[in-house]
Design a protein with these regions (language model features):
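Extended, charged catalytic domains and RNA/DNA-binding interfaces, predominantly
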Residues: 1-439
Length: 439
């Protein structure tokens, strides 16, 4: 295998992968924990600071067609500083650089997937290809064989270091028990209302995640091919399933047709696919079908995340559309948001509402703000009803209130790989400058 002992430049890894591919050994590399990369994972230059190029984009996408969206050490969808208008952006954020002791802040720009998708559109618009046209998976990143993927059963990532709730910062540590907390390069404590807690990052880890792939059969070859074509999705732990198709005739389909998925493949493209410009101004439509984890919380809503680059002035735009609401509720056309479905969590017991939420949500949606001149990407985010976070479960089981600086509840979720829309002249740069502040 090729390791960082051979080189710390990922481009050298990709070139090595190309060489063994010539020998008949295909492989895929999965970029890992971009949220903690301090902006280095999705830079707008090469490892040595050279400008991006079509050759670089092709090399990277040939070898890294998939990116890890979520795992124990945080979720890499987006950051509140990058998506201030996204009410759900603050989800399992781990803001530290990977391996930093003491913990150092990881710069969000260039560290998160949604931002990378926008950067990729911009790079392509300026004639240097799109090196960030990747699909999505989730992963666990545990070092203990098993994975604590459920909030109510989160138990460890790295064994003895975080196997005890005191060590992972979810319940206070008595003075006489401080020696029982494993020393991992210097343990710090902070006083809160209920006592002294371990701080330093473990409290920001999450019970995540899972990879999903739509493969023709359950074989290594078929699953690998699904990864290669990016027909994949990620979840933050629950076994939510997501279907996502786009096309100009998708709006002619109906969920009452038992062969609707077969028809969607025939008239559209699945997640990971590309839509090209049509001669007409017709906007693309999208078929979305999400099903809950039967052992998890019911579904609350399905959203489409859209990012685009203006052809006229290269301004990036991000939109979050609620497209399907639980319990037969309807999206408010003024706000693009579902009404509150009434789902609540009892923080004393972690009991959740049993009479609200949906087992599945499905919809055919047409982009109301489509501009055929602007490059765009679309991906799905599915939200469950709120549940207790693992740290809250730890606290109530030990007889404490949840630690006050941590979220008491979360909304577990799933994300599809995107579908990209590309106008015919996307690679002919307009005569204006890039908005450098966005980068």
């Amino acid at each position: 295998p090729y390791t960082r002992i051979d080189s710390i430049n990922p481009e050298d890894l990709w070139n090595w992968m190309d060489k063994i591919r010539e020998q008949g050994i295909d492989s895929i590399a999965f970029p890992h924990n971009s949220n903690g990369s301090n902006g280095q994972m999705f830079e707008m230059e090469t490892f040595y600071g050279e400008p991006l190029s079509k050759e670089y984009a092709a090399l990277r996408m040939r070898n890294e067609p998939i990116v890890e969206m979520t795992q124990v050490k945080g979720t890499s969808d987006t950051h509140p500083l990058l998506s201030p208008n996204d009410e759900w952006a603050d989800f399992e954020i781990m803001s530290q650089r990977i391996g930093s002791i003491p913990p150092a802040f990881s710069f969000p720009g260039g560290s998160y997937v949604r931002d990378a998708y926008v950067r990729g559109l911009m790079s392509n618009q300026f004639g240097t290809g799109n090196p960030y046209k990747f699909g999505l998976i989730g992963a666990s990143d545990t070092h203990v064989i098993g994975a604590g993927l459920r909030e109510e059963n989160y138990w460890s990532k790295i064994g003895l270091v975080d196997a005890d709730p005191r060590a992972r910062g979810s319940i206070p540590v008595a003075d006489e028990d401080r020696d029982l907390v494993p020393n991992r390069g210097g343990v710090s404590f902070q006083e809160f209302e209920q006592g002294s807690y371990v701080i330093g990052g473990l409290e920001n880890w999450g019970a995540s995640g899972l990879a999903g792939a739509w493969a023709e059969e359950n074989t290594r070859e078929s699953i690998f091919n699904a990864f290669r074509r990016k027909e994949t999705f990620a979840t933050s732990g629950p076994r939510i399933s997501v279907r996502f198709f786009g096309g100009y005739d998708i709006d002619q389909l109906s969920f009452s047709d038992e062969n609707v998925i077969k028809s969607a493949y025939e008239v559209g493209v699945p997640m990971g696919g590309d839509l090209l410009e049509k001669e007409t101004d017709k906007a693309p439509s999208f078929l979305i079908w999400a099903q809950r984890d039967v052992n998890g919380a019911p579904l609350q809503r399905v959203q489409i995340i859209k990012g685009s680059i203006s052809r006229a002035d290269s301004t990036p735009t991000e939109e979050v559309y609620d497209v399907a609401c639980s319990n037969g509720l309807q999206v408010d056309p003024m706000t693009n948001r579902c009404p509150d479905n009434g789902a609540r969590v009892d923080i004393e017991t972690c009991a959740i509402s049993q009479n609200t939420g949906s087992a599945e949500l499905k919809v055919i949606w047409t982009d109301p703000d489509f501009d055929k001149n602007d490059s765009a990407f679309y991906y799905i985010r599915v939200l469950e009803n709120p549940t207790c976070r693992w740290s809250t479960w730890d606290a109530i089981r030990a007889g404490y209130k949840p630690r006050e600086d941590l979220h008491e509840t979360i909304q577990d979720r799933a994300w599809s790989s995107p579908i990209w829309y590309t106008p015919n002249d996307a690679e002919n740069p307009p005569p204006i400058r890039i908005n450098a502040e966005r980068l």
